[in-house]
A protein has these predicted regions:
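HIT superfamily nucleotide-processing domains
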Residues: 1-180
Length: 182
């Protein structure tokens, strides 16, 4: 495998933004997002289905169908509309999902008669291009190789933690999932 660089940028809300690239990323950051309160995702027992389901009240505050020019996953070059990535360019970016149904707070949420338990896990978003319309199918092989190396680095780091049993990568894309990358 070829060499990659990983920049660790600590955001104003203490979440880490990782920038991967073939060249070292040294760009100064632009405007950051406002700090949001951490949500308290948890599992709730569904007695009619006889299974645990995830619940995250914080998801109701997530960005929902903004115009493409205000995509929260694109480079944050517009100071009037900060994004998750406060840089004007990058190769691959990785950051924690602010609206995840899982987190590592390990607290049980008491909501009366509803059975709950912690929804332990870690959810990251990997943005594999600073171009809104890019897809993996259209990426050159060296960019795909960088993406695979990024996945490998994330696997290695996450699986070294005692609270992570497995890692499941998947791609969310499209209007049906309330995502703006179509």
């Amino acid at each position: 495998m070829s060499k990659f660089h990983k920049r660790i940028f600590e955001r104003n809300d203490n979440r880490k933004l990782l920038i991967y690239g073939r060249a070292e990323h040294t760009e100064k950051h632009t405007q950051e997002l406002d700090i949001t309160l951490p949500s308290s995702p948890h599992l709730r027992w569904n007695p009619s289905r006889q299974e645990w389901v995830t619940y995250s009240s914080g998801r109701e505050n997530r960005t929902f169908f903004p115009p493409k020019k205000y995509c929260p996953f694109c480079p944050g070059s517009d100071l009037n509309f900060p994004t998750e990535i406060p840089f004007s360019s990058f190769e691959v970016a990785v950051f924690p999902n602010r609206w995840s149904s899982f987190n590592t707070h390990n607290k049980n949420i008491d909501i009366g008669s509803i059975k709950t338990k912690p929804s332990n896990g870690h959810s990251e978003i990997i943005v594999y291009s600073d171009v809104h319309e890019d897809t993996i199918a259209e990426m050159p092989l060296d960019r795909i190789q960088l993406l695979v190396e990024t996945w490998n680095d994330r696997y290695t780091e996450l699986l070294s933690r005692d609270d992570i049993a497995y890692v499941l990568p998947f791609e969310n894309r499209g209007e049906e999932l309330s995502l703006i990358h179509i």
